[in-house]
């Protein structure tokens, strides 16, 4: 199950990186108009995927305790890879959501949800910066949430990141304990 998750997550991340690298601000604007309609669905997908990955990780860790040698090392490596891919998947999904919502709001003349200092036309990298800063520190550094719906989304992202990071810490302690 973890191998399938990792193949899917890595494929998603590679395709996302490729898409972002090739995108201009105009392409992001077009995608924003098409993809921002699924706000709730994005959150449901992210939460479901991360819960499924974490459940699989817990099940894997329970099994690892009875293994030895290279098989144990391989299972631990797979578990660590799953933790990394689940973490990156979650924040990448939020980054894309932030980008598409930003440009959808711009297209429909609604107040923008985010403000990037000195960057009137943010690119995907700016939104990934925002999402991964929330993912690592629970704050937004120099990106400002400027409307209520986006602040709520940022809060959900921050709470999910906190929960994920707390569970991640517990899992890493468990992995370290299973090594001895």
Feature-to-residue mapping (PLM):
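Loop-to-helix transition at the N-terminal end of transmembrane alpha-helices
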Residues: 1-14, 18
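Membrane-helix interface/capping segments
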Residues: 17-35, 58-68
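Juxtamembrane helix-capping/reentrant segments at transmembrane boundaries
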Residues: 28-48
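Alpha-helical transmembrane segments and their membrane-interface junctions
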Residues: 49-70, 132-148
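Interfacial segments of alpha-helical transmembrane regions
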Residues: 70-88
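Transmembrane alpha-helix/helix-exit interface in multi-pass inner-membrane proteins
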Residues: 84-106
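Membrane-proximal soluble regions of multi-pass membrane proteins
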Residues: 100-147
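Pore domain of cation channels
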Residues: 126, 130-133, 143-180
């Amino acid at each position: 199950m973890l191998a399938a998750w990792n193949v899917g997550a890595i494929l998603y991340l590679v395709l996302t990186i490729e898409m972002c690298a090739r995108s201009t601000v105009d392409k992001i604007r077009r995608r924003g108009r098409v993809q921002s309609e699924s706000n709730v669905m994005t959150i449901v997908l992210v939460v479901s995927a991360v819960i499924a990955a974490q459940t699989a990780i817990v099940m894997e860790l329970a099994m690892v305790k009875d293994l030895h040698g290279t098989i144990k090392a391989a299972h631990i490596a797979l578990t660590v890879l799953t933790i990394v891919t689940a973490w990156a998947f979650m924040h990448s999904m939020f980054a894309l959501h932030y980008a598409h919502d930003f440009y959808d709001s711009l297209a429909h003349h609604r107040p923008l949800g985010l403000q990037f200092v000195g960057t009137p036309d943010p690119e995907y990298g700016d939104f990934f910066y925002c999402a991964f800063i929330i993912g690592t520190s629970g704050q937004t550094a120099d990106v400002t949430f400027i409307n209520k719906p986006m602040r709520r989304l940022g809060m959900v992202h921050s709470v999910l990141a906190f929960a994920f990071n707390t569970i991640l810490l517990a899992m890493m302690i468990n992995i370290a304990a299973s090594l001895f």
